[in-house]
Amino acid sequence: EGGIWTQLALALVKNLATLWQSGDFQFLGHECHYRVNPTVKRLKWKYKGKFWCPSWTSITGRATKSSRSGAVEHSVRDFVSQAKSSGLITEKEAQTFISQYE
């Protein structure tokens, strides 16, 4: 099933990977935000990732992973998956965004 949607998430992650724990990002013409917070779960460091675009949609991508980059990647994947399922992002928009980072 992945294909273009996985590529879209990865293109977005490439852009966010250079950024630190939180910030703003333009995605398909919308102001979006991401945040990564460290936490301890079962005596191990984990990172909670969140990606959201409040001026565009109420969808929020979330993930908890053992690395900061993993938390960003999986919260973005979660957002893209929800946005695709709700019809918020078209395949054409995804391809246009991806082409900027190839």
From Swiss-Prot:
Task: Please indicate if the UniProt record lists DNA-binding as a keyword.
Answer: no
GO BP terms: defense response to bacterium
Q: Which cysteines are joined by disulfide bonds?
A: 32-53
Listed InterPro entries: Anti-LPS_factor/Scygonadin, Anti-LPS_factor/Scygonadin_sf
Please provide the record's keywords in A-Z order. Antibiotic, Antimicrobial, Disulfide bond
Q: What does this protein do?
A: Binds tightly to LPS and thus specifically inhibits the LPS-mediated activation of the hemolymph coagulation. It has a strong antibacterial effect especially on the growth of Gram-negative bacteria.
**What protein name does the entry list?**
Anti-lipopolysaccharide factor
* Origin species: Tachypleus tridentatus (Japanese horseshoe crab)
